[in-house]
Amino acid sequence: MSSQTKFKKDKEIIAEYEAQIKEIRTQLVEQFKCLEQQSESRLQLLQDLQEFFRRKAEIELEYSRSLEKLAERFSSKIRSSREHQFKKDQYLLSPVNCWYLVLHQTRRESRDHATLNDIFMNNVIVRLSQISEDVIRLFKKSKEIGLQMHEELLKVTNELYTVMKTYHMYHAESISAESKLKEAEKQEEKQFNKSGELSMNLLRHEDRPQRRSSVKKIEKMKEKRQAKYSENKLKCTKARNDYLLNLAATNAAISKYYIHDVSDLIDCCDLGFHASLARTFRTYLSAEYNLETSRHEGLDVIENAVDNLDSRSDKHTVMDMCSQVFCPPLKFEFQPHMGDEVCQVSAQQPVQTELLMRYHQLQSRLATLKIENEEVRKTLDATMQTLQDMLTVEDFDVSDAFQHSRSTESIKSAASETYMSKINIAKRRANQQETEMFYFTKFKEYVNGSNLITKLQAKHDLLKQTLGEGERAECGTTRPPCLPPKPQKMRRPRPLSVYSHKLFNGSMEAFIKDSGQAIPLVAESCIRFINLYGLQQQGIFRVPGSQVEVNDIKNSFERGEDPLVDDQNERDINSVAGVLKLYFRGLENPLFPKERFQDLISTIKLENPADRVHPIQQILITLPRVVIVVMRYLFAFLNHLSQYSDENMMDPYNLAICFGPTLMHIPDGQDPVSCQAHVNEVIKTIIIHHEAIFPSPRELEGPVYEKCMAGGEEYCDSPHSEPGTIDEVDHDNGTEPHTSDEEVEQIEAIAKFDYVGRSPRELSFKKGASLLLYHRASEDWWEGRHNGVDGLIPHQYIVVQDMDDAFSDSLSQKADSEASSGPLLDDKASSKNDLQSPTEHISDYGFGGVMGRVRLRSDGAAIPRRRSGGDTHSPPRGLGPSIDTPPRAAACPSSPHKIPLSRGRIESPEKRRMATFGSAGSINYPDKKALTEGLSMRSTCGSTRHSSLGDHKSLEAEALAEDIEKTMSTALHELRELERQNTVKQAPDVVLDTLEPLKNPPGPISSEPASPLHTIVIRDPDAAMRRSSSSSTEMMTTFKPALSARLAGAQLRPPPMRPVRPVVQHRSSSSSSSGVGSPAVTPTEKMFPNSSSDKSGTM
């Protein structure tokens, strides 16, 4: 069976949805028709009663014949009306029943002429006229609220339609990405089978690079499609979750409307009608009861009918008469797209944190709303009781008018002094209408609040059920998660960026032109962070954040860092929102130029917001394209944020209040108080109608805001951003030609990617260019030549052709005399079994507090915290999948982190070379004295190299030395305390081996090379080739595996290397670089590379 017959098409799903919406719309229209018909029926009834009593008052002067005719006249009229049919169908309403009994009793009336005429004319008819006015007024107010309810229902259904289409779109993209991934896997398998059939002996030596290239291309394509599939799958999951949540909210809102709101709406239409009508009839009964005893039997029947005037019974009767109109419709069902089997909210790991945070926010919001709504309900009940007291005043007794001792004049005076006097009428009517107005205001507030609680409660219950199942599933008590885990995307750190133009308080256009970022990093990162963790945050952009944290985030952005890449557990949402507002508020040129202020304000003259779209669009078209792109991105985000106003309480108007003064500055000479309201209205209009105002991506290229964003773990490099920069350590000309080409052996390399140098010392080259390498300057840089110019070449952008592990061999030879070697690992086995295990933290042993400020690498250098799961080093040739995008030259530093350990991690050959390199250059201080001597040596060296910088360098070194000594003493104390607490003999600890005094101290520090620049000189390539087969499988390290007794199988992971700019070194000094007087990196620089001597290095 084909996929067309299995799954519904998008058009069919949309057609079914539109049909269901059309049916609901029809029901809503019919409801108002029914209520309007009921109101007209009541008005007709009241008009008939007024006419009846008016005629009866006139006819009371006549005799019983006229009264009999009157009764017969209305009886015949009723027999031909619809109410007569209702009576047959047992749908007789209580007011109609009273009317029937009155007519029946009228036939017995033949007496009481003048008194009854006075009472009917001055009392009963006036009451009926007031009731008619009340019916019309109450129906109009109820209709307004009903229309608002209908609009809310249609708005909810429209939102459900939008979310459903978004879900369909992302799911289609996920299916497409999955098919492409399968196609890539088939190509890889086909290529693998094809290469296996050929004999290695029959292939020529020059054909092998071509096969490797084809394999790498296929692997690149597979990895790229794998990443695309993972990203689309995550977006699809988020879109489906939103769809299901909106689906639950929509069904809950519709169900509440049909079950509760319609009933309450009918109650509003009936408010006071039955009570007022009862008073009128009781007035009539009071007059009639004083008539002759012969009428008592018939009047008792009427009294019983009046006592049975019941608004609830009539309401149920009306709803039973029109059961098809008032019955709730069918619930909206989840419409799976293209066979999607997941029909519930997914709480897997990529979205579990977000859902949990959203659940707690909903819980807090619901608690507040329920308290507020309960208070409103109490006020509503009290107001209703007051209204009932007003409407049930017992002022219908007119027995005094029938006293035989009184004259006609006394009867008139008594009537004038009673309730129906004009003064009392005006006073009572004013009080009643004022109370009614307050009641309707509170009723509207209560209905809106209860609707909001119903929707949020539905989401809350669904999230509670989902998260509860997820927790139980993790404990192994219920079924596994709905979706199988998909391959995760390799995380890549956001690069560091430093530009010549200011980010804050500068020109945004100049910054965008300089950086190449279509959206400034601070805006893009803050919006992404709020999208992931703050859409449900109450009062976002209105509640201020911590000023200290705002300044910290701002300073990080100004340094070119992105502090929000992986800090969702540390950053406050309100502080991030404050940074976003701070950035736009401090721009040198506001987002909306002051020159167009009057033009924008003039659009407010159009009362309809939809009519303002075209004038605003024509004004914004005149702005620069880069500004329009930023505006489009920002206002799309604000519109998305306003869609969660039920939870975050930030509708478009509230957002406009927050962003109006930020985005549109009021020019000098204008009254800020009077203009601010107009500014807010302009911003509100743009937020609501941003799609119609700003050009589409086809009309204007640039990044577009996406509602479903990936988290920090999946954060990829933006296609609109530029690679980060590395500041120079030495600002001298770094491209000085080498004095001799024969001092070192030249190594040939091929460029894997295009690279543009960001300083005079860095070389620029194209992909496939041939490069000459002199020696390895650091982990990430080579000294080399291209097109006759010497300079630095990034290691991650090249493939070394004829160096096969020579760099690792030279370091291994140097390390043999200094450190004990690690276990020998087979190269092939390590390449096959290079598996990533979950990262652990040593928080149980107190390392979080000891190493909270400084993380020590195996070579003794302090390294910043990095996100786990990614590696900044390129894999060795022929091993592992290659990366499809150029690696960044600089990594983004962040706050210190605990030391991670990997269980069962088998390191790749390239990482073993990095570990060997780190251990070769390490320096162990035997005691604090040696540490102080090293610091003083560094201070002396720094003063000789940078004597022109002044005395502040020595003060900085002293402060740094004091800080280092304090940190080391604290670390030693806590680690020794841990050692004393452990009863089992522990294996040597990495940190203890680094910090504790050694029994056999090494030779003088000056005898060891302090920098890799002194050892990376390949003089005998043949010898390196001879040793490559054996030394490539070795992993040289200064320390033994840490915590081997505590964590079985735990092995140190090589720390991620950050590209540190090597110092300037000419080739003429390479042969003597291992001497004491060489300008190498001092021990303190290796421990803390971010000190004063490295301030101009990588940020």
From Swiss-Prot:
Residues 352-392, 952-987 form a coiled coil. SUPFAM superfamilies: BAR/IMD domain-like, GTPase activation domain, GAP, SH3-domain. The record marks R542 as: Arginine finger. Disulfide bonds: none annotated. GO terms for biological process: regulation of postsynapse assembly; signal transduction. The modification Phosphoserine is found at S817, S820, S821, S837, S858, S954. Residues 506-694 form the Rho-GAP domain. GO terms for cellular component: glutamatergic synapse. InterPro entries: AH/BAR_dom_sf, F_BAR, FCH_dom, Rho_GTPase_activation_prot, RhoGAP_dom, SH3-like_dom_sf, SH3_domain, SLIT-ROBO_RhoGAP. PROSITE patterns: F_BAR (PS51741), RHOGAP (PS50238), SH3 (PS50002). Pfam families: FCH, RhoGAP, SH3_1. CDD domains: F-BAR_srGAP3, RhoGAP_srGAP, SH3_srGAP1-3. Residues 1060-1074 have a biased composition (Low complexity). Residues 19-314 form the F-BAR domain. Residues 470-493, 809-846, 861-911, 994-1014, 1045-1099 are annotated as: Disordered. Residues 809-820, 1089-1099 have a biased composition (Polar residues). Residues 744-803 form the SH3 domain. Keywords: Coiled coil, GTPase activation, Phosphoprotein, SH3 domain. GO terms for molecular function: GTPase activator activity. Homodimer. Forms a heterooligomer with SRGAP1 and SRGAP2 through its F-BAR domain. Interacts with WASF1. Probably interacts with ROBO1. Interacts with FASLG. GTPase-activating protein for RAC1 and perhaps CDC42, but not for RhoA small GTPase. May attenuate RAC1 signaling in neurons. The F-BAR domain mediates oligomerization, binds membranes, and induces plasma membrane protrusions. This is SLIT-ROBO Rho GTPase-activating protein 3. It comes from Mus musculus.
